[in-house]
């Protein structure tokens, strides 16, 4: 089973070197554990501002040295744009072929689905999403949740890309959540009335 561990690119809560020392200790104690490292604020930080490609590469080099083989590139505050995603994905996929990359995009500025699609078309095949786009970010007030699971699966289905995931079940889950769990939702499909806005 994968264990997901989030570490930011900056030094706001803990110095990066300390974070990677902790990570190496976890790796040494649990050598068989599959760790997915969430590289928080990859595309921009609410505290440090712009994050450069060079900073991301340096961070990933430390992750590789710590024995990490799976990393999610996280747009924690929903600031990324498709060109930025495409360029960064191209660089890291070339420089770190031994790392399995995923993408984790927040939909704060309504660019979650296009940024996620850009990552997929750039060669990233694992994505983080949430039903209904539910969620937010505790240190970025106003940030939306991740790209909506059902919105993304609907789009990929329409494009002929098989995800192996049921759009109908995701939609049912998203509507249930919205009715029963007070939260911030950025999804669109769950707001369409049944049998409306359809073809045929």
Each language-model region and where it sits:
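Single conserved hydrophobic/aromatic residue that forms the stacking wall/gate
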Residues: 1-13
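Catalytic cores and adjacent flexible loops of soluble metabolic enzymes
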Residues: 11-200
């Amino acid at each position: 089973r994968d264990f997901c561990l989030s570490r930011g690119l900056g030094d706001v809560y803990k110095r990066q070197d300390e974070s990677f020392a902790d990570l190496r200790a976890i790796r040494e104690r649990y050598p068989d554990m599959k760790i997915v490292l969430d590289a928080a604020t990859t595309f921009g930080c609410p505290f440090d501002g712009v994050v450069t490609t060079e900073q991301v590469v340096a961070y990933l080099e430390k992750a590789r040295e710590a024995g990490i083989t799976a990393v999610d590139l996280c747009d924690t505050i929903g600031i990324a744009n498709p060109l930025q995603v495409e360029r960064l994905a191209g660089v890291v996929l070339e420089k770190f072929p031994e790392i399995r990359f995923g993408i984790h995009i927040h939909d704060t500025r309504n660019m979650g689905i296009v940024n996620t699609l850009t990552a997929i078309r750039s060669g990233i095949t694992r994505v983080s999403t949430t039903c209904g786009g539910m969620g937010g970010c505790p240190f970025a007030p106003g940030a939306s949740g991740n790209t909506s699971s059902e919105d993304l699966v609907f789009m990929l289905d329409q494009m002929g890309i098989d995800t192996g995931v049921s759009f109908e079940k995701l939609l049912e889950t998203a509507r249930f959540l919205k009715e029963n769990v007070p939260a911030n939702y950025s999804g669109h499909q769950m707001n369409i009335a049944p049998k409306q806005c359809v073809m045929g």
